[in-house]
Amino acid sequence: RLHMDPCWTNDPTKKAENEADISAFSMARYRLYLQKLYIPLIKDAIAHGLYVIVRPPGVCPGDISVGDKYNRYLKAIWKAFAADEYIQQNSGIISIELANEPVRVHLSDGSNSDKALHDYFQPVVDEIRAQGFKGIIWVPGAGYQSQYQDYAKHPITDSEDNFSYAVHVYSGWYGNMTDKNCNHNTFIRNFKSQVPMVETKPIMVTEIDWSPEDPDKA
């Protein structure tokens, strides 16, 4: 999993508050370092026999809305990435994770709806396919990539039928697990409830940790 780190894509003359702040983002720098850094890193990983999942620079702001500045940012990032000749030639090995850890996703007017996730990410999928990229697209959910129920009602559609969902798995998100209270069946039941498409589609876990609370007991 390659993070196109914003320390390269941000204009050094501008100050970004955190990785969710895209005010310092420079498309010119992104295009430059896509060629000078990110694609060479991808090539090196492939030379080592790895498949590469690429995520965009930074993380989602806590609240995002359909058609907002961050939505346009994701479309611009992936439009440039998906149009690249090398990326297209290696689309069987390189896949795209649309965003990192959306938290709360709203309609364009800021209201809540079970259509918001679909309406936010469907246009990003469409933008990628419009460039001719045919590789796998991994779609994130809400709640830091732990909530996917809304996609069961409003699923993503894909002209290539070559997409699924990227999920983050931290034990507390699927049943408040602790060292003293960890039940595999509870975890599995909650995971199936929160990520219902796990029953019908291959799921990619792009972050996972189950470290003991007391590291001396590891």
Residue ranges and their predicted role:
Residues 1-60, 73-75, 117, 122-132, ...:
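Aromatic-lined substrate-binding rim segments of carbohydrate-active enzymes
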Residues 65-95, 99-218:
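Extracellular glycoside hydrolase catalytic/binding regions
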